[in-house]
Amino acid sequence: MARYLGPKLKLSRREGTDLFLKSGVRAIDTKCKIDNAPGVHGARRGRLSEYGVQLREKQKVRRMYGVLEKQFRNYYAEAARLKGNTGENLLQLLEGRLDNVVYRMGFGATRAEARQLVSHKAILVNGKVVNVPSFKVAANDVVSIREKAKQQTRIKAALEVAEQREKPTWIEVDAGKMEGTFKRMPERSDLSADINEQLIVELYSK
């Protein structure tokens, strides 16, 4: 399945919530009718079946983290094999992706921009270049900007935007050095309450 390259606001409207696909700190619903689905008849968001609600939640989380359908299924399968709560395991696996960690540290204004930085070899993990967005970041790994990429305007702009966002407690960042430490995996209470991962578990358990 190809990665979606169309308007980002349309995806957020489709899911009825801000997916944080656009840069900036202004809430997305101040820019568009987030409660209305896209299209001419968007205002008529119909009632969904139980399956439809579960599917929408899966699509929302998948799009939020910028993961393709096959990748998402693989993450779910891995989460189900791990001990503990499958839904929480799934969110932790997604949070541990390098592109997401780069975004959380504020080096990218969006997850898509963070993914580009990784793919373009602008990111170091423990001093070594890693250009795989899905790379699993472990506790105490140090993620930093490669020296020759530190002058990129978009990275500096992203760090300015990140200053206005709530800072994750599981990450420590030195903006001056453009370096951060992934201290631990986030707990469920650290993450968005707007995600209902149990719906995704129910969907894949059918």
Curated annotation (Swiss-Prot):
Signal peptide (UniProt feature, chain positions): none
Any one annotated GO CC term: small ribosomal subunit
Assigned keywords, A-Z: Ribonucleoprotein, Ribosomal protein, RNA-binding, rRNA-binding
BP GO annotations: ribosomal small subunit biogenesis; translation
Matches recorded under Gene3D superfamilies: Ribosomal Protein S4 Delta 41, Chain A, domain 1, RNA-binding S4 domain
One Pfam family here: S4
Molecular function terms, GO-annotated: rRNA binding; structural constituent of ribosome
InterPro entries: Ribosomal_uS4, Ribosomal_uS4_bac-type, Ribosomal_uS4_CS, Ribosomal_uS4_N, S4_RNA-bd, S4_RNA-bd_sf
Organism superkingdom: Bacteria
Residue ranges annotated for the S4 RNA-binding domain, each copy included: 96-158
CDD domains: S4
Subunit structure, as described in the record: Part of the 30S ribosomal subunit. Contacts protein S5. The interaction surface between S4 and S5 is involved in control of translational fidelity.
Biological role stated in the UniProt entry: One of the primary rRNA binding proteins, it binds directly to 16S rRNA where it nucleates assembly of the body of the 30S subunit.
Family, per entry: Belongs to the universal ribosomal protein uS4 family.
Protein known as: Small ribosomal subunit protein uS4
